[in-house]
Amino acid sequence: MDLLFFDIGATLYGTDASQVLRIDRALPEDLTLAELGLPHRGNRAIVFDTPEGEAHLKVDAVHGVRSIPVNSLRRMPPTAGAAAYAVGVCLEEARTVLLIDLVETARTQGRH
């Protein structure tokens, strides 16, 4: 599976690269989500499609797309009580990276 890795604040996240339309400059009204942490600068935005049109998530850095073996991915169990946008984790080298669904992230903010 191809994942896009990015930073919000000091935290590394990943998302399904097929959800991403492009990386752009961030605008003041772009989406931030306190639960993911606030960007230090938030100069970049991940642009993705929602049923209502494009949405933008502010990020600090984009690390690019990497193909990750499926056996390195874990779904978030329903009993974990995680937010709807937290779909799983990626076991990346010596750390665990939270994988988020961009469309669910926008819905969390009422931007759907």
Curated annotation (Swiss-Prot):
Biological role stated in the UniProt entry: Necessary for proper aggregation of cells to form fruiting bodies. FRZ genes define a system of signal transduction analogous to the enterobacterial chemotaxis systems.
UniProt keywords, alphabetically: Chemotaxis, Transducer
Protein name: Frizzy aggregation protein FrzB
Keyword Transport attached: no
One GO-annotated biological process of the protein: chemotaxis
Lineage top rank: taxon: Bacteria
